[in-house]
């Protein structure tokens, strides 16, 4: 692997920008502003140099697997395309949020197993550091044994506890939403109704199942999240099980309870871009402004983290270092990845070179992931290294 020196850029170092050179050797940042034996030099004049985005919740890959209801594409094709999209949008660490529900179809046991196996097989070929985030529907009681096996075997990188049962039952009375659920499951309406009835009938078994799975995850050292917490009491109950991340808390009191309790909170970056949630729930930009949002995730749209960070700056909600922490250092800290999310010697070399001339439309010029230059627009900026002195910033 070649050695690379990045010169002339405005480099994000903690809470400030500095005119320093960044030296990459192998998979890591070797040094800042020091002489090096780099074989290649990147002219970053006029560009920002930022840590790569760490996206802990994204399910946009599902649209590559099933772009329309009932239309399936091979998982390897879907993963390769999702990887390309993630990288070109600055996401160098991606957690594919995979729902394992009691439903057949896209969110079935078979699909979860196939996706996990595909990620494990393809991981060495993928450009982004690709991890498996299992979204466990807690009413899916039959999955408990296998999930615990996967946790013990180290196959799950992140585990979320989801419960969409109430909304599923409520949506049965709305024809359009009902049809969408039935199509996704790939069964008849009568069969879907039967499945829902069976699941609801066992709801008394769910709390103990959550406790057992959480105990296994703790022992395995796997970070856990709870999804759509709706009361401070529910958040407190999950915290008692070492579930340290509140993912999309649906109201301000619950988000505040999470932050006050030392937890991380996750909101959707698309929510920031669109000015609100597509579900009509919490407005993410308001949560950011009130200090109640720790992390922004791509959710269903890979371009969103990059754009949302710059949108928050443009709207005078945060400074860029503060906004960038929401998509890089904070998510890295939340999942225990101490080797990324910051530009410093010894850190993993995940770096973005960004043209910010248009404040709300940042353009990624280059992406370095794990020390590899994996995306480049403007090859003239990459040269054979000459003298070890730095270029002056433009």
In which residue ranges do the predicted regions lie?
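Active-site glycine- and acidic-residue-rich loops that bind
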Residues: 134-145, 229-233, 237, 245-247, ...
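Hydrophobic faces of well-ordered beta-strands that scaffold small-molecule active sites
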Residues: 52-56, 94-96, 130-134, 157-163, ...
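His/Asp/Glu-enriched, well-ordered alpha-helical/loop segment
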Residues: 261-271, 275-356
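Metal-coordinating catalytic core of metallo-dependent amide/deamination hydrolases
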Residues: 100-229, 299
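Glycine-enriched alpha-helix->loop->beta-strand junction motifs that scaffold or abut catalytic
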Residues: 153-157, 238-245, 260-266, 291-294
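Histidine-rich, glycine-flanked metal-binding segment
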Residues: 1-50
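C-terminal cap of metal-dependent C-N hydrolases
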Residues: 9, 26, 329, 345-394
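Metal-associated gating/positioning segment near the N- to mid-region
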Residues: 44-115
């Amino acid at each position: 692997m070649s050695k690379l020196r990045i010169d002339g850029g405005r480099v994000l170092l903690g809470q400030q920008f500095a005119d320093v050179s960044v030296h990459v050797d192998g998979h890591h940042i070797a040094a800042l502003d020091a002489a090096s034996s780099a074989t290649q030099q990147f002219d970053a004049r006029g560009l920002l140099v930022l840590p790569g985005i760490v996206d802990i919740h994204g399910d946009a890959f599902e649209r590559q697997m099933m772009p329309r209801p009932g239309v399936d594409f091979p998982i390897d094709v879907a993963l390769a395309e999702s990887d390309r999209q993630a990288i070109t949008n600055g996401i160098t660490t991606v957690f594919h949020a995979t729902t394992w529900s009691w439903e057949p179809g896209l969110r079935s046991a078979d699909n979860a197993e196939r996706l996990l196996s595909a990620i494990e097989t393809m991981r060495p070929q993928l450009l982004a550091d690709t991890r498996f985030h299992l979204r466990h529907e807690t009413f899916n009681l039959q999955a408990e044994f296998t999930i615990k096996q996967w946790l013990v075997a180290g196959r799950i990188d992140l585990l979320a506890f989801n419960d969409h049962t109430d909304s599923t039952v409520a949506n049965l009375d709305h024809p359009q939403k009902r049809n969408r659920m039935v199509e996704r499951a790939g069964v008849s309406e009568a069969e879907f109704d039967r499945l829902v009835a069976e699941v609801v009938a066992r709801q008394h078994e769910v709390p103990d199942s959550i406790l057992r799975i959480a105990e296994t995850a703790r022992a395995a050292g796997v970070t856990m999240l709870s999804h759509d917490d709706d009361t401070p009491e529910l958040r407190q109950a999950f915290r008692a099980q070492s579930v340290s991340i509140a993912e999309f808390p649906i109201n301000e009191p619950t988000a505040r309870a999470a932050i006050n309790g030392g937890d991380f909170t996750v909101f959707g970056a698309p929510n920031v871009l669109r000015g609100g949630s597509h579900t009509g729930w919490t407005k993410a930009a308001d949560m950011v402004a009130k200090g109640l949002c720790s992390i922004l995730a791509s959710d269903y749209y890979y371009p969103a983290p990059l754009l949302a960070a710059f949108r928050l700056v443009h709207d005078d909600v945060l400074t860029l270092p503060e906004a960038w922490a929401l998509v890089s250092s904070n998510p890295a800290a939340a999942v225990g990845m101490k080797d990324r999310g910051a530009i410093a010697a010894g850190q993993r070399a995940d770096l973005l070179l960004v043209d910010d001339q248009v404040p709300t439309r940042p353009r990624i010029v280059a992406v370095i992931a794990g020390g590899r230059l994996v995306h480049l627009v403007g090859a003239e900026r990459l040269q054979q290294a000459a003298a070890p002195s730095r270029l002056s910033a433009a």
